Amino acid sequence: MCSTERLLFILKYGIAYVRFHKEINGKIEFIEQKHIMRYQQMFAALTVRNKIDEGINSGVIWHTQGSGKTALSYYLTYVLADYFSKQNKVAKFYFIVDRLDLLKQASEEFEARGLIVKTASSRAELMEQFRNNQAQEGNTGKPEITVVNIQRFAEDRSKVELPAYATNLQRVFIIDEAHRGYKPEGSFLANLLDADKNAMKIALTGTPLLKEERESWRVFGNYIHTYYYDKSILDGYTLKIIREDIETQYKERLSEIYEKLEILVEKKDVKKSQIVEHDNYVKELLRYIISDLKRFRQIQGDNTLGGMVICETSEQARKLFAYFDEIQAELNKDASMKSHLRAGLILHDSDDKDTRDKIIDDFKNNMTVDILIVFNMLLTGFDAPRLKRLYFGRKLKDHNLLQAITRVNRPYKENHYGYVIDF
């Protein structure tokens, strides 16, 4: 591990000063923290460099969720910029995501480490960057990375035309969450990657690629480097996850309410989804969730621990939020339950972006929101170490399930586990 070559590699590329805000004595302050490249990040970066020497310019890096793939991407910008400079080439980096919230999170992580982040809000803006044939868009002289939300261009299937290639420019595409629905032919991303045959293409994933997905991602080739769940847990970068069933009494009440509502549904022309949106069902669900999170905090002796509810429908999410304070007031009549939880609702069509960002920040950093109520948002890429209790109100499968449950696997204080409660 500590050979001279590796030690020099870490000293040259593997130290970052990360700026973030943290609550200190009741105040939010900005602090800088020195981060050292983790060993799996070092081996991945070394392997990428070795693959280029072998003439391989694409591949997949599978590092388990929560092990620092965005940080790895940051280190790669320095490693590869230096590598290509020795070949009289200037590297230009693109970080590709497929969600708006992931664009924001990745941008913040890169900026916290000192990278200048550029974004492209339209196809025209992105194409203008390509036409410039410049490694840097700004004039600061600091390292840059362009973060692109490919979802903006999902319906754009037109061919991407690039100007005559600048022989000293080396484009590097880093594609985040490589396991998700990418079609190797006909999409804007495929056309973009295909337009520059000389570009490096590094696909990141936190979950294994299934057989059909490996076929879909054949454009990236084989695994460059892997770092599995068991190693991440042993190394202390992620926590084990425990699945819990809901208490029998609540399970029986919810089943009884569901069965009664189901009978009503059969008599009327009503969608079954409306059962889980019914006031009676929602209120009983809230009684369990609020009581459970409060007891969990009492047992752990930590009132900073947070929760998240993944709802069956967006309407159910709205109702859970609407009835939250009412049900909490009812439960607070019991002295053992008399503490106050604050809920935040995160839906793509609820509130504006600034309001949603404020709610998320209040949960992650300010600790003025204790439980998030969601439907589709924040199930991937959301990194909040205090989140330790995840309530599944609906079924998720395959990668969506793996992505969601790993929201609770980040180390936090003295916690040894993240918990998933399955309804």
Descriptions of predicted regions:
Residues 101-125, 323-332:
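Conserved helix-turn-beta segment of the N-terminal RecA-like "Helicase ATP-binding" lobe
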Residues 164-201:
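SF2 helicase catalytic motif II
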Residues 1-97, 101, 105-116, 141, ...:
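ATP-dependent helicase/translocase motor core
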Residues 53-57, 139-142, 158-171, 365-369, ...:
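Short basic/glycine-enriched coil/helix segment immediately N-terminal to the Walker B
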Residues 111-158:
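Inter-Walker segment of RecA-like/P-loop motor cores
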